[in-house]
Swiss-Prot record:
It comes from Parvibaculum lavamentivorans (strain DS-1 / DSM 13023 / NCIMB 13966). Gene3D superfamilies: 4.10.410.60. NCBIfam families: rpmI_bact. GO terms for biological process: translation. One of its GO terms (molecular function) is structural constituent of ribosome. This is Large ribosomal subunit protein bL35. InterPro entries: Ribosomal_bL35, Ribosomal_bL35-like, Ribosomal_bL35_sf. Belongs to the bacterial ribosomal protein bL35 family. One of its GO terms (cellular component) is cytosolic large ribosomal subunit. SUPFAM superfamilies: L35p-like. Keywords: Ribonucleoprotein, Ribosomal protein.
């Protein structure tokens, strides 16, 4: 049986931490910044850790060798 490929969109969007958690970028900063408060915009910087239930789905379906 051939090797499974990791989804190319998953490679670009997610990284695994050393402890096996899934790190992802923050959502909600593509457009419409004028209506958001400065605090909201500031708190959306950087990355965050994905929830366990969602992370399990990402790893199982899209990252076969993670």
């Amino acid at each position: 049986m051939p090797k499974l490929k990791t989804k190319s969109g998953t490679k670009k969007r997610f990284k695994l931490t050393a402890s096996g958690k899934v790190k992802r970028g923050q959502t909600g900063k593509r457009h419409g910044m004028i209506k958001r408060t400065n605090k909201q915009i500031r708190n959306k910087r950087g990355t965050t850790i994905m929830a366990d239930a969602d992370a399990a789905r990402v790893i199982k379906n899209f990252m076969p060798y993670a």
